[in-house]
C-alpha cells in the first residue's frame, strides 16, 4: 500500500463490474452489511453511487464507495464505506468532499446521515467535517437477534437557505 500522499485515486460512477468487490468490502466492515439487493435497489432507484478506485500493485481496486439519495433541497447519505486496508488514508473525507460537490451541483441545502450511536470514531470524523448532531432514531440499527441500536442523526448545511419569495432581504 502506498502512503496517502502518493495514492493514485480516482472517482468512478457505479459499474456492475465492481459489484463483487463492493460486496466484499461491505461484508468485511459491517456486522449487518447491506445485501446485494440493497445495492441493486439503489441502482434501480437512480441513487448516486460513487466508487473510489486506487492503483495498488499495478491493479485498480475499489477502496471505498458511497450511496446517496437526492431529495428536495437535500441529500441523504445512506452508506459510506472505506475498505479496511485503505482506512486512515483520508479516503472517507475524499468521498465526503465529492458528495458535497455533487450535492451543491443539485442545489441541495442540507446533507443528512445516520450513524450508529456506538460508532464514535465516525461521529468524530463527521463532526470534524462540519456535521452537527441534530437528533437520534431509537432502535434504528439491528444488533444481535432481538436487539437494536440507536442512530445519531447528523446534518451539514451546504448553503444558506434561499429567502422566501416576496422577501425584501
Name these PLM-found stretches.
Residues 3-4, 10-89, 93-102, 106, ...:
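Acetyl-CoA-dependent GNAT
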Residues 13, 90, 94, 117, ...:
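Residues at secondary-structure transition points
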Residues 41, 118, 141:
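Positions that flank functional sites
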Residues 45-46, 122, 145-146:
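Short Asp/Glu-rich motifs
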Residues 83-97, 105-106, 110, 116-124, ...:
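Conserved glycine-rich acetyl-CoA-binding loop
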Residues 114, 127, 132-150:
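Conserved catalytic-core motifs of GNAT/GCN5-like acyltransferases
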